[in-house]
Amino acid sequence: MRKRTAVIVGACLVGQVVLASTPASAGSPIRAREVVGDLDQPVAFTFGPGKKVWYVEKGTGQVRVHDLDTDSDRLFVTVPGVNGDGERGMLGIALHPRYPNKPYVYVYATRSAEGQLRNQILRYRDDHRSGVGRKVLFSSIAGGSPYHNGGRIAFGPDGMLYAIVGDAHDSGNAQDTTNEDRGKIIRIEPDGDVPPDNPFNDRVWVFGIRNSFGFAFDPQTDALWETENGPSCNDEINLIERGENYGWGPNETCDGSSPGNTNQDGPSPVLPELFYENTIGITGIAFCEGCRLGQSSDGAAFVGAVNNGEVTRIVFDDQRVGIAGHSVVYDHGGGTLSYEIGPGGRIFFSDFNGINKLVRV
């Protein structure tokens, strides 16, 4: 078991009293500027050519496109049968890495299919600005609870599609590696096939995942970093490596103040690079490479929180395999959700009502 020592005393669960983690400096020059407003829970978005934001609305089933240059908005497709209860709904979106030459749009949705609620990755073809030819690439039972569905999808530097599949509020799923996709990060080819170099001869890339909402690839190393939500303790930031176990499972507990007290299930569990003793509802993550937020931000990652809206800057060690420091640089007030890199390398994030850009003032 690897030992990691970076600790933050964070916030409590949604609906409870929120305690500050590391208060944002009053002199911090980082602020947020809304670029798209009046949206209905845009929990996931991505960018396409021509300063276009592709986003999903959690409960409506809609995939929409907003042109930042003209401030115009259009419907791409409405996914049928979407269930937006709890943490279900339209949860992820990605464009094919060669879009528009490969005109495919991918979404992760909780929807009625095959006679039950399922979490599915769907691929649509962009035909004259409308989504057609729906194809199911992945389908997993959503479970009886509306929580822990995952949903983040993104293409990696290797051209493969990665997706978070939550444990469906059943902690045993995370350690079940016998034909169980829940509680995992999966990796598939753009057409849904299983890559031959996956570690378990199936879609699973890593296991022991609980209730993650975010991951991103470090542009300097291609390494995958993930954010993870604990029960009532120990939200995490993890360095994800092929075939590893990230320790969440049926014995999760908060009897103690270290990650070893909460996520030690299964073989050789990997402990986090950083954790919060109390939860902040950690969400998206994005890397700054020329994001124009100051020299101290270049090479750092920015992570969000749904409980208190704090934006935290994460600084890495020289090898970029560990975390050297962290600080809250902006307090959004309300929760922040997905984080993405957009035009000009700028960092954007969504909240429950719109999409925002981090700026330096």
Model-identified regions with their sequence ranges:
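Blade-loop segments of beta-propeller domains
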Residues: 72-96
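Beta-strand-rich domains and repeat architectures in extracellular enzymes and scaffolds
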Residues: 34-61, 280-292
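Surface loop/turn motifs at the tips and blade-to-blade linkers of beta-strand repeat domains
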Residues: 34-40, 77-85, 138-144, 203-208, ...
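Asp-box/WD-like beta-propeller blade repeats and closely related beta-sheet repeat scaffolds
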Residues: 118-154
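Beta-propeller domains
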Residues: 54-78
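Beta-propeller domain segments
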Residues: 60-61, 88-90, 98-100, 167-326, ...
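Secretory targeting and sorting signals
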Residues: 1-26
